[in-house]
Amino acid sequence: MPETNRIEYKRELNIDVDIEKEVIAFLNYHEGGVIYIGIDKTGNVVDVSDADGDALKIKDRIKNNISPSAMGLFDVVVEERKGKEIVKITVASGSEKPYFKKKYGMTD
């Protein structure tokens, strides 16, 4: 299944993946969407080495780094595809648009 405007694939969760940005895009989109961690851009399943740990990190990042609160608008689960573990993030369209990434640090 190829990527679409409602499906996004990420090979892995690493420093280069701004998962908050992806979630915010779906929160602000009128239909929401699904993000898969552990599937590459061509749709091939790759194993997530610590799927449970990644799922917890993702939940924490969404909860703490997005405003207004996205609680109740997303679900993060570990699934098995082709014998490998992946992380599936289902995001509903938010009702308090626009959603944005919180900034941290001192302000002027």
Per-region residue spans from a language model:
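Conserved N-terminal catalytic/coupling substructures associated with nucleotide/phosphate chemistry
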Residues: 1-108
